[in-house]
Amino acid sequence: MPFPIFFRAQLSNILRNSPRSISTSSVRSTGARASMSPKSPLAPRHFLSIDDLTSYEFMQLVDLARKAKHAIESGQTPPSPKDGLAGKTVAMMFSKRSTRTRVSTETAVAYLGGHPMFLGKDDIQLGVNESLFDTSKVISSMVSCMVARVGPHSDIEVLSRASTVPVINALSDAFHPLQAVTDILTITENFPDPNGIKLAWVGDANNVLYDLAIACAKYGINVSIATPPSYPVPSDMLQLVRNAAHLSGSSIETTHEPEAAVKGAHIIVTDTWVSMGQESEKALKLKQFAGFQVSSDLAKRGGANKDWRFMHCLPRKQEEVTDEVFYSPRSLVFPEAENRLYAAIAALETFVVKRGYFGA
C-alpha cells in the first residue's frame, strides 16, 4: 500500500479523539509492572505487556491504531509538526533479528517525524562487557524512547528500571504487546462487536499467546487454548489471563485436544512451533505437535463457526497451517501483518508523545 510522503509528525492531532470505553482496573500479578502511571510528571511510563494497561487504556490504544490506519489510508494531511517526534531519536535495541517489528517500528518513527536508530547486538553493548543497567542509563540520556527486542523478559525489565525515557517491548520471551495490539485491531475490523466471540489458539504456549489472551480477555473475547501436554500454559501466565477474564466476564479454558479448542470458534490462531533459540528442539517438537496443524479438516472435525477466520503473526511454516487455509479467504494473515505499522504508531504516540497519558 503506498503511503503519502506528507504523513509525518503531526499525526497526533488527527488521532487525538478516540471514543471512551468502560474502564476497569489493571491487574498486576507478576513481574515489575514498570508501565504503571508515572509517580511524577517527569517519570517515563513503559509498555512491557498488555497486563500493564487497564481495559480502558488498552481499548484506547487499539482505537488510536485504528485512527492511524484511517488517517494514512484516507490521505489526511496532518496539521502541525510540533506534536510528533520531530527532533527526537528512538533507539531500536534488537538482540534478535526481525522483519515485521523492525520495518513497522522504523516506518512509524519516520511517519511521526522522528529518527529511528537501529542498534543490533553487533552494534552496541547489550549485556556484553557492560551491564544492561548501565547501557540503559547511557542510551536513555541521549534518546527519547527505547524500543527493545530481547530474549529473557528480565532484560527488558532491567532496561526499563534504568531508563529515563519510555521503554516499549518489541518482544521478549514472556510478552509481545505490539503484536497483541495488532491482533485485536485485526479482530475488531472483522468482528466489530467482539464481546462474546470465541478465539481458539492451537499450538505452542508462548509470548504471543500470553499477551493475546490477556488482550482478548480485556475485550470480552472467550479464549480456548490447545497445547500438547508437554507444553502447557504456565500457571502464572494463566492466572494473569483469568484475572482479566474475571473483570470482563469472558472465559478462558485450556485443553490438549485441538478439536475441543476450535469448537464454535470464530477465530483460529497459531504461531511458530519453534521459536528463535529453540532450533535444537525442532525434531522433538514436530513429533509432539503432531495433530496440531490448523486445517479445514481440523475446523470441520471440531465444529468451528461456519465463518471462522485464521490468524498467524508470521513467519509461518507449513507444518503449523496448511496452504489451503493460509492463503484462503478465511486468512487474515497479511492484513494482520500490515496492522503492525498502526500498532507501532499508536504505541509511540501514546508512550512517547503523550508520555503515557490516555485522555482525550
Give the positions of each predicted feature.
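N-terminal mitochondrial targeting presequence
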Residues: 1-37
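Active-site cofactor/substrate anionic-group-binding motifs, chiefly glycine-
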Residues: 89-142
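Anion-binding alpha/beta catalytic cores of soluble intermediary-metabolism enzymes, centered on
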Residues: 136-139, 144-215, 312
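Adenosine-phosphate binding glycine-rich loop
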Residues: 305-309, 313-360
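Positively charged, low-complexity intrinsically disordered leader regions
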Residues: 27-103, 107, 175
